[in-house]
């Protein structure tokens, strides 16, 4: 004989380290769940990146140049130096309704034509199939107010003809290139680039709504501080449309800037056009008065001194008129307390003082000379004013015609070649990380809130006897997996583990249980053993059937009664039929003495559950069941009764009154200590003592760091 013993001693570490190790081990055990969930997230991300609508980006560059100083105020000095452009204000102008509204009107953006596709995946599928360029160009679409809530659908018949219908009953047929008018609806389709049968939804948006959409998709930033260069970026689904939209925005911004710059000249020209006739009229009146006075006084000539005074007064009036123009310009930029404005006012005051002195000299002249000086001054001053206005008019006309504004489009809009979003690599990576995190958190939370029994010591520390610890059979697990893949229920086996692989560690543990039962049942009132469970699907029937098999191998007659009349499957496990089973016996349709069915294992008989009755618990409370147990106890060395889980139904509490020994099966890492204690409490309330617990399906866990260690034993015959 060859004996192999393996001991895996758990390290003795601090509590914090044990907790970390347990968490890591829990994740390692559930690695396939983690991998599976992460793979699902990654797959969803891949599908999303394939079917999500790509968003493109177009950009343009504009420069805001510094305004040149006005010719009328350049000579004021350094106080009138040029200012850097106010970029923040210009950014707001670009995003204003004035600029964007004109773009909406120019490009007919308030009319949207969208192809009808399958929800979510349709547009992406069309792109994959190369059909994303199917479009219908609509330039005019109006409908009466009562139809504003209706949805209009355009159906393509061919590359020239189409039909237009609405969910309100409207229907019409039209041709591309011709205006369709019917019942107040006006539609102009310029071109059709789509397959026959394609459907499009035609929508009319409000101008304000489209402006808001443009503002959401438009980004304007300044390149550098006070650099006067603005970067415009626009995002959207259509590569060509976003380029056209951004070009239109830049062009409209430039045009409004030019209009704003030339508006002042236009207003000044209009004012001069109104003032020139009046000034000319006053000049004519002054000339007529002077000529009449000269004729009346026989052409009076002025002495040299009077002429000098007259020339000085005319010159001062000309300077005062020039200052009036300058003051009009400066007042737009500065207040009267500004040094430049104060300089102008001081110069005006000096001229006024000089003019007052000259007026005093004129007053000292003879009356005839005073009058001729006054009339001559009025004529010459009027002529200078008139000529100044004519010169100003010509300047303004030149200014208006040559205005270029402060905005220059440096780079026209161009759509970038790549896709702005979705960023496929980043999305897939993010989905993998998210799936990994969520799966790990889920595994840890499940482990935290569902702490199954992880060692026999947990039960023993609470005063619960553990009669056997049965390891998980890899041989049985492999056979169950094959059966599952083939679509057969896991419990439908043709061979017990005790027969198919009698040297399995699980069977050795059941043999150890057989030895323990031999001594445990010595003081029992009868030879009837009830096997119950804490909850469903814990391997109770597996333990019960294999225990009966190994006991029968000791030359003892064993009867297994399947008392789970709801879901019992022992007859399938042992390869027998379900005819004339327990339910038929209890309702009097079967004979107790002939109910036992032999199995393929010698001295091992079975009473199957029979047909599923409507009242299993009531049948177990009948006298007929007591008679069956008494008969079986007398005719067999051991009677094993397989009952349903105590936490699920009350059948085990009923059967327990007729047995001498009760054992309860709990599954390792599945059932909790609370469930075991609750089950024992149920039996205690019904006066049924439970001898102990069988811990089933023990496996080596990565998270099970225990100070008692983990042992594996193999004890096989030497090969001959």
From Swiss-Prot:
* A Pfam family the protein falls into: AAA_31
Q: How is it modified after translation?
A: Autophosphorylated. Seems to be phosphorylated through a cooperative two-step mechanism. First, Tyr-569 is phosphorylated in an intramolecular reaction that generates a significant increase of protein kinase activity. Then Tyr-708, Tyr-710, Tyr-711, Tyr-713 and Tyr-715 are phosphorylated in an intermolecular Tyr-569-dependent reaction.
Compartments annotated for it: namely: Cell inner membrane
Superkingdom, taxonomy of origin: Bacteria
Q: Which residues lie on this side of the membrane: Cytoplasmic?
A: 1-31, 446-720
Modified positions (Phosphotyrosine) are 569, 708, 710-711, 713, 715
What does the record give as EC number? 2.7.10.-
What terms describe the molecular function in GO for this protein? ATP binding; protein tyrosine kinase activity
Record-linked InterPro entries = AAA_dom, Bact_polysacc_biosynth/exp, GNVR, LPS_length_determ_N_term, P-loop_NTPase, Wzc-like_C
Return the GO cellular component terms, semicolon-separated. plasma membrane
- In Swiss-Prot or TrEMBL terms, this protein is called Tyrosine-protein kinase wzc
The organism is Escherichia coli O157:H7
Q: What is the lineage of its organism?
A: Bacteria, Pseudomonadati, Pseudomonadota, Gammaproteobacteria, Enterobacterales
Q: What gene name is given for the protein in this entry? A: wzc
């Amino acid at each position: 004989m060859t004996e192999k013993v393996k001991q895996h001693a758990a390290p003795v570490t601090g509590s914090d380290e044990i907790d970390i190790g347990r968490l890591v081990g829990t994740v390692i055990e559930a690695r396939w769940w983690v991998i599976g969930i992460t793979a699902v997230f990654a797959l969803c991300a891949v599908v999303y990146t394939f079917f999500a609508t790509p968003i493109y980006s177009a950009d343009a560059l504009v420069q805001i140049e510094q305004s040149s100083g006005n010719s009328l105020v350049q000579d004021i000095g350094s106080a009138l130096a040029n200012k850097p452009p106010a970029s923040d204000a210009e950014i707001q102008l670009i995003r204003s309704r004035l600029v964007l509204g004109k773009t909406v009107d120019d490009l007919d953006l308030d009319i949207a034509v969208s192809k009808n596709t399958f929800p979510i995946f349709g547009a992406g599928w069309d792109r994959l199939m190369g059909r994303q360029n199917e479009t219908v160009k609509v330039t005019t679409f109006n409908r009466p107010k009562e139809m504003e809530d209706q949805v209009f659908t355009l159906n393509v018949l061919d590359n020239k003809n189409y039909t237009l219908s609405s969910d309100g009953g409207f229907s019409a047929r039209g041709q591309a290139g011709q205006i369709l008018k019917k019942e107040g609806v006006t539609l102009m389709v310029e071109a059709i680039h789509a397959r026959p049968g394609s459907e499009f939804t035609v929508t009319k948006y409000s101008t304000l709504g489209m402006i808001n959409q443009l503002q959401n998709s438009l980004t304007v930033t300044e390149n550098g501080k006070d650099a006067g260069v603005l970067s415009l970026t626009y995002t959207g689904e259509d590569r060509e449309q976003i380029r056209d939209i951004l070009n239109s925005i830049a062009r409209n911004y430039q045009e409004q800037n030019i209009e704003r710059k030339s508006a002042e000249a236009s207003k000044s020209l209009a004012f001069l056009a109104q003032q020139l006739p009046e000034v000319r009229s006053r000049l004519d009146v002054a000339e007529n008065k002077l000529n009449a006075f000269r004729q009346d006084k026989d052409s009076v000539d002025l002495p040299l001194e009077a002429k000098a005074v007259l020339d000085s007064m005319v010159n001062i009036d000309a300077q005062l008129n020039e200052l009036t123009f300058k003051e009009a310009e400066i007042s737009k930029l500065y207040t009267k307390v500004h040094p430049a404005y104060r300089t102008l006012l001081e110069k005006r005051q000096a001229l006024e003082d000089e003019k007052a002195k000259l007026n005093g000299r004129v007053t000292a002249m003879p009356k005839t000379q005073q009058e001729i000086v006054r009339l001559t001054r009025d004529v010459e001053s009027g002529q200078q004013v008139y000529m100044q206005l004519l010169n100003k008019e010509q300047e303004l006309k030149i200014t208006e015609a040559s205005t270029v504004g402060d905005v220059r489009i440096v780079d026209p809009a161009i759509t970038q070649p790549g896709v702005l979003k979705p960023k496929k690599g980043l999305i897939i990576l993010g989905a993998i990380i998210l799936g990994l995190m969520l799966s790990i958190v889920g595994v840890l939370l499940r482990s935290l809130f569902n702490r199954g029994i992880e060692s026999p010591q947990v039960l023993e520390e609470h005063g619960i006897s553990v009669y056997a610890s049965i390891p998980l059979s890899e041989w049985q697990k492999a056979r169950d997996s094959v059966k599952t893949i083939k679509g057969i229920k896991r419990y439908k086996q043709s061979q017990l583990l005790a027969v198919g692989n009698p040297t399995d560690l699980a069977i050795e543990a059941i043999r150890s249980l057989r030895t323990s039962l031999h001594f445990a049942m010595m003081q029992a009132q009868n030879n009837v053993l009830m096997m119950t469970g804490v909850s469903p699907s814990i391997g109770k029937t597996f333990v019960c059937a294999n225990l009966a098999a190994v006991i029968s191998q000791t030359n003892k007659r064993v009867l297994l009664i399947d008392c789970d009349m709801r879901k019992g499957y022992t007859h399938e496990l042992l390869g027998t039929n379900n005819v004339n089973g327990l339910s038929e016996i209890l309702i009097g349709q079967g004979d107790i003495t002939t109910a036992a069915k032999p199995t393929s294992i010698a001295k091992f008989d079975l009473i199957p559950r029979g047909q599923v009755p409507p009242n299993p618990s009531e049948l177990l409370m009948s006298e007929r069941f007591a008679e069956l147990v008494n008969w079986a106890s007398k005719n067999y060395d051991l009677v094993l009764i397989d009952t349903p889980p105590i936490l699920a139904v009350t059948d085990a509490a009923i059967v327990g009154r007729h047995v001498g020994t009760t054992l309860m099966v709990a599954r390792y890492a599945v059932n909790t200590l609370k469930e075991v204690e609750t089950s024992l409490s149920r039996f205690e309330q019904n006066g049924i003592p439970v001898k102990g617990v069988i811990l089933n399906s023990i496996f080596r866990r990565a998270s099970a760091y225990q100070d008692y260690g983990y042992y594996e034993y193999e004890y096989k015959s030497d090969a001959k």
